[in-house]
Amino acid sequence: MKNLSVIIQARMGSHRLPGKILKKIANNSLLDWVIKRVKKSKKIKKIILATTKNEKDDILQEIASRNKIFFFRGQNQDVLGRFYKAAKTHGAEVVVRVCADNPFIDRKLIDLLIEKFKSKKYDYICNHQNRLNSKYADGFGAEIFSLELLQKLFNNAKKKAQREHVTQYVWDNKKKFRILALQAPKSLAYPSLKFDINTLKDLNYIKKFVRANKISLLSTASDIVKYKLKENKPKEVKL
């Protein structure tokens, strides 16, 4: 697949936990966890960190440089516009979108999205746990689509929510697009589990969880779910 890129969406100005992407989890910042785990994908050649022009985000350019990935800065509020221009500027024809608050993003799940997209049967594919009952635990999510689709969103999305959330227009107009939500395998079908970081409570929990289970950049999504199940036994979803 030509000109395939991952775009990681990141900024310092989180409302609930400002600066969370630089918070340390073991020996890496949250953002470093995301970047380094994405880099383990066997199918990704280019990674782009997309952030804002706010001076608070200057440090993210340094992080991108240190990790030897590409960088783009755009408008703060128009996240869709920033995302589209990042893809356009760096010549991406197919984009995998990853959020910077998911430290356990799994390269195997990213590679699976890419393989499914190669069929050209779908405009948009995701593994979000809250989308079309895909049943994935929360925190492994990513989505894939073409630059052509992204341009349609950029040109047609008018509502505030559609500019703030990159693919909201797709979900508001589901009948216009060929959508696939990948179904979780049995080992990951625990939608009640949560691994993303939005609050200080989330961060403190993940720090303890990583330390207690010696989780590393090589730990898989299946490993992480197994460790979590040792703590508590959530109801498994029947497939």
Regions found by a protein language model. Give the residues of each.
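Conserved core of the sugar-phosphate nucleotidyltransferase
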Residues: 105-193, 204, 208, 223-239
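N-terminal nucleotide-binding beta1-loop-alpha1 segment
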Residues: 1-17
